[in-house]
UniProtKB/Swiss-Prot annotation:
The lineage of its organism: Eukaryota, Metazoa, Ecdysozoa, Nematoda, Chromadorea. This is Ubiquitin-fold modifier-conjugating enzyme 1. GO terms for molecular function: ubiquitin conjugating enzyme binding; UFM1 conjugating enzyme activity; UFM1 transferase activity. Expressed in the intestine. It comes from the Eukaryota. GO terms for cellular component: cytoplasm; striated muscle dense body. Signal peptide: none annotated. CDD domains: UBCc_UFC1. Interacts with uba-5. E2-like enzyme which forms an intermediate with ufm-1. The intermediate is formed via a thioester linkage. Belongs to the ubiquitin-conjugating enzyme family. UFC1 subfamily. SUPFAM superfamilies: UBC-like. InterPro entries: UBQ-conjugating_enzyme/RWD (IPR016135), Ufc1 (IPR014806).
Length: 162
């Protein structure tokens, strides 16, 4: 893990409540912790000039959507990002999807869900329920984009938006 990732990870508060959307009031408490962690992560990223995503959810906090972006050779590449909170959350990590990249890389499942199984999922399992959405972005989506997006650009499979 590089120093920038370690630094951004340390700035993300850990979650305490082990709850999923089916847990009623406990889920509301977990959702508050998730938002606090996301806000801290976004603020830290902005403070370090590494702002790279924005997220929002439906009212129940079960469906999340937003944008993520990656700069390559001074050009911004922006993507829609979405995921649902699994019923077994936080034991099961969310499956983060970049739908417009579906089928463009082998490190992706149907529907544009990024492949995180080898490196991220064991880390998530060791840190349940402390890790949350912000951690999934910092340790899952961020590193995935850092590897895959430049490769897709070099192969001519993605173009910057006008």
């Amino acid at each position: 893990m590089d120093d920038a990732t370690k630094s951004s990870l340390k700035a993300i508060p850990l979650c305490k409540t082990k709850a999923s959307p089916r847990d009623g009031d406990l889920w509301i408490e977990r959702l508050k912790e998730e938002y606090e962690a996301i806000i801290a992560a976004v603020q830290n990223n902005k403070d370090c000039d590494r702002d790279w995503f924005q997220l929002e959810s439906n009212e129940r906090g079960t469906k999340w959507f937003g944008k993520c972006w990656y700069f390559h050779n001074m050009v911004k590449y922006e993507f829609d990002v979405e995921f649902d909170i699994p019923i077994t959350y936080p034991v099961t990590a969310p499956e983060i999807a970049l739908p417009e990249l579906d089928g463009k890389t082998a490190k992706m499942y149907r529907g544009g869900k990024i492949c995180l199984s080898e490196h991220f999922k064991p880390l998530w399992a060791r840190n349940t329920p402390k890790f949350g959405i912000a951690h999934a972005f910092a340790l899952g989506l961020g590193p995935w984009m850092a590897v895959e997006i430049p490769d897709l650009i070099e192969k001519g499979l993605i173009q910057p938006k006008a």
